[in-house]
Amino acid sequence: LKSLVINTITNYSTSKLQKFEGLFRYSQLIQDIDDTDTSILSNITTLKIRKDFTPTIDSAVTYQVYFRNALYNPHSGHNTDMGGILESSGFKIQGSDEEMFLNDDGQGNVRLYYLVSGVKTYQNNTQGTINYTTGQVTLTSLNIASVSNIGGSASTVVELTVNPSSNDAVSYTHLRAHETADN
């Protein structure tokens, strides 16, 4: 069943999004998933938008990442303790052996942190900004020394993932299925 649903999402992406002016319609995707098999009575699908950037290694660079969609932030300080709505893949910075990550504080600040026994330890609470209205993320003077593997494979990019404010976000070019649970 899982592979059938992933195939449905892939087909939706190919037929609806990867053509000129293709628009993502959440309700249509949900219906397509429900129609995949008679055993599916309904589904809860959460959308996230991901952008990748290729860092300039061993240089303090300001990065601008444009999601081109409004981002979910219903109130100032939303989800601060859990890391806001921004998440990143790992990387190392100059002067540290720790694997670093990015998140946000729900107030427009991008934070740089590493994990100690699973607990976030913030190294810089103002590594950049996130504009929830425009979807622009700015990372200021970030000096990346290396990029971590992603999904067990070598990578040359840092992935940034956010929650859109609307399920019918406009700027999707393709969809990828990502399961968070096997049920």
Q: What role is predicted for each listed range?
A:
Residues 6, 61-108:
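C-terminal extracytoplasmic interaction modules
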Residues 7-15, 19-24, 89-155:
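Extended, beta-strand-rich, solvent-exposed assembly scaffolds of outer structural proteins
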Residues 39-43, 49-54, 129-169:
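C-terminal, active-site-flanking charged/polar segments
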Residues 183:
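Gly/Pro- and small hydrophobic-enriched strand-loop and loop-to-helix capping segments
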